[in-house]
Amino acid sequence: MEVDFGGGYLSSDGGGLILRELERHSGLLKDFADCFIDYRDQRYIEHRVVELVSQRIHGLLLGYEDLNDHDHLRRDPLHALICGKSDPLGQDRSLERDKGKALAAHSTLNRLELSAQAIDERYHKIQAQPEKIEELLIKRGVKAIARKSAEIVLDFDATDDPLHGKQEGAYFHGFYRDYCYLPLYCFCGNIPLFAKLRDCKRDASQGTVEALQKIVPAIRQRFGRKVRIIVRGDSGFAREAIMAWCEANKVFYCFGLARNDRLAEQLESSFESLRAQIKEGTVQSPCRRFTEFEYSTLNSWTKARRVIGKAEILLQGDNPRFIVTNLPKEGWRNAAQAARFEPAALYEKFYCARGDMENRIKEQQLDLFADRTSTHWLASNQLRLWFSVVAHLIMSTLQAEVLKGTELQGASVGQIRLRLFKIAARLTLSVRRIHIELCSAYPLKGLFGLVHQRLGALRTPA
């Protein structure tokens, strides 16, 4: 057996070419790059903003979380092709030390990430525009929602993002027992619409009304005012300001409700009845019963609202749970939905489905590295979070438009990366063409061919 490094230009990310073709049809990264102002002298630059953005986000999609990774990836001509470089071998670089390295080094990408800070006369010549980025994410996210949707569910949640040291905005959170950020997310299914990085010295729901004020008009502009919008969240979002805004703007909501003594009293009779039935042997533990009633807090709410209570007896003991909603018990005109918002169905089938958003946040942090917020400044960490959100939006578009009906339609980002992008590839470059050979033993050739066919059928944006 003999081993050497004479195999030529090889890459482990051959399937990343799918991302290149998807960008050609969607133009998302180009639009995202337009959210930056480039003050550099264009006569002397070698990496355009769109190429820097593409390099960073495609790196996340292909599993490379750290800027230091790009000091090695910049030598990979396949990555250069994915990012739109016309000279994938880097032979035309102006400095001799950079020849053979088509992509930017970590220092250049670092200056891009620090663009959220004030412009420095010498080093920081690219400026991010947060308002435009936020507007773009909402616009492209809403556009990704199925066009014929009659009902749109917006899931809100906050999560912890542990810090890496004494960073800007570092505070201790009593619930998570750590120093962390507290990002706020909004998803529609697997489509990210909003992500705000915040310090943790605040209520988890803070900023939800401001997010809704941007998201809801964008949805109604595309789908019309008749579309039903339902906001869903855990008990941290059962706040007067959010519920009152929804009621004033004809938006429905369904939130968890933290238990208290007054709420517990409403379930006493249900628990007594269940215990009697267990004693008689007519039911067995675990068992549950749902109750509906009107409820208002003593001070914080301005009106009584519909509350569903779940009296549940588990082997470990009683488990009372509550939700508050303005969804109509009778449903809407469609007879098929008549019982959809009855107490049991509303809690078990609709509210509990909120838990799927936890998987989206898990994908953000584990698969797309949204928790790699290790710069000192909050603003540059927000930009890193947006990079991960844009990457997630690309993957959700791929699943909806290309992977629909395939075995990867409902797969996680990590599974899609592993099974579709991580393909050994050899590049051969000549004067006239670039030839890419993929691994002969790749087990999903049929799926890859179908993806290629569907990408070719996508309409290029005007």
Task: Show the residue positions of the predicted features.
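Dynamic "connector" segments at or just before major functional cores
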Residues: M1-D178, L182-D203, T208-G224, Q399, ...
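Acidic, His- and aromatic-enriched active-site or binding-groove loops in soluble protein domains
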Residues: G174-D178, P183, Q213, A248-L263
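Short amphipathic alpha-helical "interface-anchor" segments enriched in bulky aromatics
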Residues: L22, H70, F341-L383, F387-Q399
